[in-house]
Amino acid sequence: MDDYEKLLERAIDQLPPEVFETKRFEVPKAYSVIQGNRTFIQNFREVADALNRDPQHLLKFLLRELGTAGNLEGGRAILQGKFTHFLINERIEDYVNKFVICHECNRPDTRIIREGRISLLKCEACGAKAPLKNV
C-alpha cells in the first residue's frame, strides 16, 4: 500500500499545472452590426484569438452553419445577409462545444492537430485526443 501511494504521488507530480486550475472559461461575445444586406462582426479576430483558433477555421464554420458567403477583412468578418448577434453568438457556442472544449475533461486548453488526413482535437491539460469532423 505504501508503494501505491508513492507511485500515486509521483504520477500527480508529473501532471501539468493546468490540470489543477479551476478557472471558468467564458466564451467571448461577438459584436455585430447590420448594414444594408451585410452583417459585420467587428471583433472577429479577438473572438478567434480568445478561442485559440485560426480565424479562417472559425469563419468557415460560421459560414457553413449560417448558410451564407463571407470573408475576413482586417480584424472583422463580413457576412452576406442579415444575422442577429444572438444567432451569431449561438453558432460560436456550437463551435466552442465541437472544436474547442475537450470531450474528456471539459477544458478549453486544446488545439487542432492533423495526423495524416484526420483532424484531431488534442487537449493540453489531460492529453486526450478526439477525432473531429471536417469543416
UniProtKB/Swiss-Prot annotation:
* UniProt-listed Pfam families: eIF-5_eIF-2B
Q: Which InterPro entries match?
A: IF2/IF5, TIF2_bsu_arc, Transl_init_fac_IF2/IF5_dom, Transl_init_fac_IF2/IF5_N, Transl_init_fac_IF2/IF5_Zn-bd
Source organism, top-level taxon: Archaea
Q: Name one GO molecular function term.
A: translation initiation factor activity
- What residue ranges carry the coiled-coil annotation? none
Q: Keywords on this record?
A: Initiation factor, Protein biosynthesis
Q: Which family does it belong to?
A: Belongs to the eIF-2-beta/eIF-5 family.
Quaternary arrangement and interactors, per the entry? Heterotrimer composed of an alpha, a beta and a gamma chain.
Could you tell me what this protein is called? Translation initiation factor 2 subunit beta
Species the sequence originates in: Methanothermobacter thermautotrophicus (strain ATCC 29096 / DSM 1053 / JCM 10044 / NBRC 100330 / Delta H) (Methanobacterium thermoautotrophicum)
